[in-house]
């Protein structure tokens, strides 16, 4: 999943240090957007997509090499609670990558010449619950249930062609295995995957 304008991310990481953005939600809140919502920054994919692009662009122009998309809490289940159907939800999830790519193009237009990358964020099951349980895990779900939760969103994100899939705040080994199984079964064949875990 390599960008048309940047070298392979895995090779770049092997060669040295890259600067990750300072947190999409931080920039959005600094710009005055209220993220006190079960969808968190994903709400803006539907309501204020331009704000998401502007936040990514601010990080690129400030020196970030990699930005993380607004898809951490973008799930089919979360959107369904807002009355958003699966087709529209899939489009919104995919748009998180498109908005970040637009920020890459705008950064280029402003003279940013260094390599830039887009990391598609996928939060844990607890992020969809929006009750803080992404820091604890222990959802009482089987590995198969967790795999079925992660698969549809990972399929959409992979199809949107980010440079990396970022599995964020995975709270325990059981959940970490679920997206790994999905990816190993070819959902994102050829992709580079980054993972961040938090074990209490």
Describe the predicted segments one by one.
Residues 1-200:
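Domain-level signal for soluble alpha/beta catalytic cores
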């Amino acid at each position: 999943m390599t960008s048309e304008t940047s070298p392979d991310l895995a090779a770049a990481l092997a060669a040295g240090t890259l600067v990750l953005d300072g947190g999409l939600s931080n920039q959005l809140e600094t710009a005055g957007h209220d993220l006190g919502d079960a969808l968190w920054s994903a709400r803006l994919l539907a309501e204020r997509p331009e704000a998401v692009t502007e936040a990514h662009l601010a990080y690129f122009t400030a020196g970030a090499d990699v930005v993380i998309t607004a898809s951490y809490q973008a799930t089919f289940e979360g959107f369904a609670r807002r009355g958003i159907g699966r087709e529209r939800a899939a489009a919104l999830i995919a748009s998180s990558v498109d908005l970040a790519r637009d920020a890459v193009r705008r950064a280029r237009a402003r003279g940013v010449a260094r390599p830039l990358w887009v990391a598609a964020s996928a939060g844990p099951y607890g992020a969809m619950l929006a009750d803080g349980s992404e820091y604890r895990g222990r959802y009482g779900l089987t590995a198969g249930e967790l795999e079925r939760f992660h698969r549809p969103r990972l399929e959409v994100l992979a199809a949107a062609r980010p440079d990396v899939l970022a599995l964020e705040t995975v709270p325990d080994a059981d959940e970490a295995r679920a997206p790994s199984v999905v990816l190993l079964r070819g959902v994102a064949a050829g992709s580079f995957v980054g993972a961040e875990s938090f074990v209490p």
